[in-house]
């Protein structure tokens, strides 16, 4: 049976992740409050930020930037968008 969470991003009960995606308190908070579906959406957002901003993941500043963005994405109303990004029409 899948673990269910009340997803803070989707505002509904959904399947939770199997393990914390990040270490520390932020990882625990995400594991408890974010669904697999919402995490997959974040990974797409993160990929756009890395590519559009040409982030070097070996640079500690780039990793810190993404940690701040993931926290903003789920818990503070939204992360930065890639410049020029236009969401697909539904």
UniProtKB/Swiss-Prot annotation:
Q: Name one GO cellular component term.
A: cytosol
Keyword line: Iron
The UniProt entry, under NCBIfam families, shows: PRK05408.1 (NF003817)
What the entry lists under HAMAP family is as follows:
Fe_traffic_YggX
Return the protein name: Probable Fe(2+)-trafficking protein
Question: One GO molecular function term?
Answer: iron ion binding
Domain of life of the source: Bacteria
Record GO biological process: cellular response to oxidative stress
Q: Which family does it belong to?
A: Belongs to the Fe(2+)-trafficking protein family.
Database matches in PANTHER family: FE(2+)-TRAFFICKING PROTEIN-RELATED
UniProt xrefs under SUPFAM superfamilies: YggX-like (SSF111148)
Cited function: Could be a mediator in iron transactions between iron acquisition and iron-requiring processes, such as synthesis and/or repair of Fe-S clusters in biosynthetic enzymes.
């Amino acid at each position: 049976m899948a673990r269910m969470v009340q997803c803070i991003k989707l505002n509904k009960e959904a399947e939770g992740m199997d393990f914390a995606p990040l270490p520390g308190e932020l990882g625990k908070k995400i594991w408890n409050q974010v669904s697999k579906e919402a995490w997959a959406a974040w990974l797409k957002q993160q990929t756009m930020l890395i590519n559009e901003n040409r982030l070097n993941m070996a640079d500690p500043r780039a990793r810190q930037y993404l940690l701040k963005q993931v926290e903003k994405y789920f818990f503070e109303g939204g992360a930065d968008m890639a410049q020029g990004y236009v969401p697909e029409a539904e």
